[in-house]
Amino acid sequence: MSEFRTEKDSLGEVNVPADALWGAQTQRAIDNFPVSGQPMPSAFIAAVARIKQAAAEANASLGYLDNEKRDAIVEACEQLVNGEYADQFPVDRYQTGSGTSTNMNVNEVIAAVAARAGVEVNANDHVNMSQSSNDVIPTAIHVSAVTTVQTRLLPALSHLCGMIYEREALFSEQVKTGRTHLMDAMPVTLGQELRTWREQLLATEKRVEAAVDDLMSLPQGGTAVGTGVNAPDEFAGQFVKFLATDTGYHFRSLEHKFVGQSAIDSPVALSAQLRGVAIVLTKIANDLRWMNSGPIHGLAEISLPALQPGSSIMPGKVNPVIPESVAMASAQVMGLDTTVALAGQSGNFQLNVMLPLVGANLLDMVDLLSNASSILANKAIKGFSVNEDNLNAGVGRNPVLVTALNPEIGYALAADIAKEAYRTGRPVIDVAEERSGLDRPRLEALMDPLKLTRGGVS
């Protein structure tokens, strides 16, 4: 048996591996773009397959595609969505800017799968009916992003928030020294500190959800340039109806399809919100690293779970590996967002020509953030222990507590008391008792660290 077979397209003949399901156009792309060795993510291929399925159903409902071909295309698409033939989509993500190579890769594989089932289906005339790469690929960016954010990222963030809430409630009255500029400040509770992280995450969730809702509007039906040439007038409406049924998401048709093809503003907006998630995760990771620092000459407020030896030369050293991993993943997300922003500038006239890059980057961002959120919840937040002695020993001696005396004795005298406490190393309450004119019980009431975490004026 020959190692290759000959396929033909409008440019001529091409040798294709004999056992490959793809055809001539896919093979040309494989030959033309040996750039990264990274194909489009599987979630993107699944989204294109969903688009092909809904398009076949729409075309059949309008009388343009016979039921036998529709059923063969739909069955092939279901197989692709379920991960079958995953090795048949090798086209590099750094390819033609419209993503035509990936669109044709999917078209050709679907046609081949249908042929195996005994139905002759043409990749262009039937699988790609009423479509262009120029509306399929932007639509696939939307569909794949919506699907992965809803099924992966939002559940991961919700799990992280829930884990933080559990620890937050546990430490609601554990007082610690607050820090501004990394310097000692007024006391807070560990619960307040944890709640801050949770509130940040909840806010980013809402912003991501809003960006996802914007992505529900699809440019499918705009075909080549946004006008809808070669697509029936009713196609776009029928398409979103079937896609919503097939996926369970309430997709809608973009009124002015040009804006979803010549520009990618909605994907860029989602990317920015994903960057926002990365920024929050970085803040949490950095706080955890500082709180865990030491254990002898650092803050040593908490102890993160010991997950692996930290050094190949220093015995006994254990490092905060989960926060470090989360910080690196978050940095990568921020870099990917910058790339998406640059790609968003590449909308020349009627088509953006960095579509595969945007689609792949968004899915990489979702993967990184989902996984980072999960390990942060399960391997850091869940298992850290609190070093109560360290927290309690420092907070009561903190000269900054004299801030609570400002309303009673004025800023200037309070500053002098703080300076003397710093200079002598004596407890600030002892210095205040000598110099403030207030008795010990009053000072204890005013400078009670737990009371000070509740705000107000004593």
PLM segments and residue spans:
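Conserved, well-structured ligand/cofactor-binding cores
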Residues: 1-458
